[in-house]
């Protein structure tokens, strides 16, 4: 079993900024992150406040365009 990092690698998802968030894009990022959790956040996406350092969060605007990324 692979050893997993304690925090996400944002470099993996940096290319998504400016793109429309789609289920396919989320799966693509998840695959690039070796199965690490990935989710969209923003006005169109309900989300919880739980903190998961390995998770990549793609924060979107009202048009579902990714405007920033962060771990958590």
Located regions from the model:
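Exposed, flexible binding/inhibitory loops of compact, secreted disulfide-stabilized domains
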Residues: 1-72
